[in-house]
UniProtKB/Swiss-Prot annotation:
GO terms for biological process: 'de novo' pyrimidine nucleobase biosynthetic process; 'de novo' UMP biosynthetic process. The active site is at K61 (proton donor). It catalyses: orotidine 5'-phosphate + H(+) = UMP + CO2. This is Orotidine 5'-phosphate decarboxylase. It comes from the Bacteria. One of its GO terms (molecular function) is orotidine-5'-phosphate decarboxylase activity. Belongs to the OMP decarboxylase family. Type 1 subfamily. SMART domains: OMPdecase. InterPro entries: Aldolase_TIM, OMPdecase, OMPdecase_AS, OMPdecase_bac, OMPdeCOase_dom, RibuloseP-bd_barrel. Its EC number is 4.1.1.23. GO terms for cellular component: cytosol. The keyword Lyase applies. The lineage of its organism: Bacteria, Bacillati, Cyanobacteriota, Cyanophyceae, Oscillatoriophycideae. Catalyzes the decarboxylation of orotidine 5'-monophosphate (OMP) to uridine 5'-monophosphate (UMP). It comes from Trichodesmium erythraeum (strain IMS101).
Amino acid sequence: MNIDNIIVPLDVPNEAAAIALIEELPEIIWWKVGLELFVSCGPQIFSILKQRQKRIFLDLKFHDIPNTVAGVCRSAASYGVDLLTIHATAGRVALSRAQQAVLEGAKIIGQKPPRLIAITILTSLTSRDLAFDLKIPLELPEYVLQMALLAQESGLSGAVCSPQEVEQLRRVCGDDFLLVCPGVRPSWAEVGDQKRSLTPAQAIKAGANYLVIGRPITATADPREALRRICQEISGDQKEGS
């Protein structure tokens, strides 16, 4: 595990703020573009990142009928992004169509297709939310597993899950299935609205490929120092466990 496995969200309101954050953390390779920034400045953000040789995690969490998600995934892939998300609850047909569309979109520009990964369930939700609000009669870990298996069976590259589900998904889905984990909080940071969090070191030990770490880095007075502390915490834990 190294800094290339950390994804920092560009959870900022506009292009100027995005550029400022990117330049403040030059060592970060992976940046996540979510709904707020994409709605604010559109595909221009992709050019900004590519000019700086960054990799792009486009996290718009597509969720619609099969024809619509296929169209939007084809368009997204044609921009040359590296990772792309779709909700597993869009269903098997939509997932399969989206995966095929990603290949088609990448072919248009002659580039390697992005890896399409499924949102299993939002990391802000709890077992109680699943049972009482969403009326889903499964324990949360089982539900996440079923969504991940649906994604894998539909040809997707991986899934987004909380760190607490990583160990089970890695065991069942295998080493080639990409696991991306938001809801990661270092030992010294507040959990906030993430209900199923672990520390970066714990998530890595469980089998995560990429860690999405936002506010513990970006909401601090010194983001570079926060990033250094996170890397130090991970490195120290790995040395202790070796």
